[in-house]
């Protein structure tokens, strides 16, 4: 984008990344305004005070930068699209990634629909990712800082959204962003963002307990032998070892959950490795790149080490991902995001890891 006369709305959380993103755009001569999201209704018991604290901090940063600051209430769509799905997924023994849905539906999706109300043409965020536009279209790329790259959380964004997005931090490194914030004495928090912003204390159990009941059930081994009792599927995730309450000479981990039977299966560490993963809601962003292109890698969790993709094939409404080497604890509900070099090719939601019929 070269037209500095068109207003850019910067999604501001009060954190260092979005604050420096706004500052960098100002330094480049752009017309900038800040916008923060009201994501909690007044009757929401969890996280409302935390959300208001962030909004107030963003307002302070905007004042320090000398730019207008606005608040947009997206609490309804956030509740419907993010929190409700989060709870539903956990009730089924899955482990969702709410940030991906939030970016698609709320923080980017819904906010892009709002910015014309402010006569703005673009939305900027503090994500560590890049957008490349060329004769083949608009592409999503990793951020330059591999340790902070957030393209994983953005893989569902359509090209028409990417074409209106600006990522000022895409070519920068976190250490430099912190240095810039200190140099400009911006009133921001240096703490990393919460994994799940609507559970700022990290107490998933208490959060879920306000929205659903927990039904105890059996813990089984691979042979079907009953080893113990679990306290409710939402309290567990694939790969979990702590909190099982099992007396065993072998280290056992949650390997599978059956919501219909309300059972949890456990297995040894090595038995959680798989080189076959079934994906739903599959997205392929780059139609010009075949599914059998060599050199593709996949991340099955945000912090997971990448694994080489051997083959992608369609099976009914799903896609089967076959890997050159196994990954550990492929978790239903998490996203598997596929890359070729720095480019995000697509991905889907993990339904099952292991032998797929």
UniProtKB/Swiss-Prot annotation:
Upper taxonomic lineage: Bacteria, Bacillati, Chloroflexota, Dehalococcoidia, Dehalococcoidales
Location, primary (coarse class): cytoplasm
Active site: 102 (nucleophile), 197 (cysteine persulfide intermediate)
Gene symbol of the encoding locus: mnmA
Homology family: Belongs to the MnmA/TRMU family.
CDD domains, alphabetized: MnmA_TRMU-like
Catalytic activity: S-sulfanyl-L-cysteinyl-[protein] + uridine(34) in tRNA + AH2 + ATP = 2-thiouridine(34) in tRNA + L-cysteinyl-[protein] + A + AMP + diphosphate + H(+)
Protein name in UniProt: tRNA-specific 2-thiouridylase MnmA
Disulfide cysteine pairs (residue numbers): 102-197
The enzyme's E.C. designation: 2.8.1.13
Positions with a binding annotation for ATP: 11-18, 37, 126
């Amino acid at each position: 984008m070269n037209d500095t006369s068109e207003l850019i709305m910067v999604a501001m959380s009060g954190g260092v990344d979005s604050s420096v993103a706004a500052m960098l755009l100002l330094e480049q001569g752009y017309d900038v305004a800040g916008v923060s999201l009201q994501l909690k209704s007044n009757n929401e018991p969890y996280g409302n005070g935390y959300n208001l604290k962030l909004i107030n901090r963003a307002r302070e940063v905007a004042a320090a930068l000398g730019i207008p600051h606005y608040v947009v209430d997206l609490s309804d769509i956030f509740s419907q699209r993010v929190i409700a799905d989060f709870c539903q997924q956990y009730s089924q023994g899955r482990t969702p990634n709410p940030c991906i849905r939030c970016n698609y539906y709320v923080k980017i999706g819904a906010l892009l629909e709002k910015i014309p109300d402010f006569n703005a043409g673009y939305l900027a965020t503090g994500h560590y990712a890049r957008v490349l536009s060329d004769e083949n279209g608009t592409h999503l790329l990793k951020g330059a800082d591999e340790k902070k790259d957030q393209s994983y959380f953005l893989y569902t964004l359509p090209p028409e959204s990417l074409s209106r997005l600006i990522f000022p931090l895409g070519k920068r490194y976190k250490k430099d962003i912190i240095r810039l914030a200190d140099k400009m004495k911006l009133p921001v928090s240096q703490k990393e963002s919460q994994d799940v912003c609507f559970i700022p204390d990290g107490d998933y159990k208490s959060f879920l307990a306000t929205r659903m009941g927990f039904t105890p059930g059996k813990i089984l081994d691979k042979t079907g032998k009953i080893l113990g009792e679990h306290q409710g599927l939402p309290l567990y995730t694939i790969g979990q070892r702590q909190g099982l309450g099992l007396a065993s000479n072998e280290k056992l981990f949650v390997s599978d959950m059956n919501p219909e039977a309300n059972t949890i299966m456990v297995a040894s560490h090595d038995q959680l490795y798989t080189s076959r993963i079934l994906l739903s809601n599959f997205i392929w962003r780059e139609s010009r790149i075949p599914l059998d292109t060599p050199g593709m890698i996949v991340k099955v969790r945000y912090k997971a080490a990448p694994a080489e993709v051997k083959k992608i094939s369609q099976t009914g409404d799903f896609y089967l991902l076959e890997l050159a080497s196994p990954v550990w604890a492929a978790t239903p509900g998490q996203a598997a995001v596929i890359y070729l070099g720095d480019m995000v090719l697509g991905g889907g939601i993990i339904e099952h890891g292991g032998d797929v019929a």
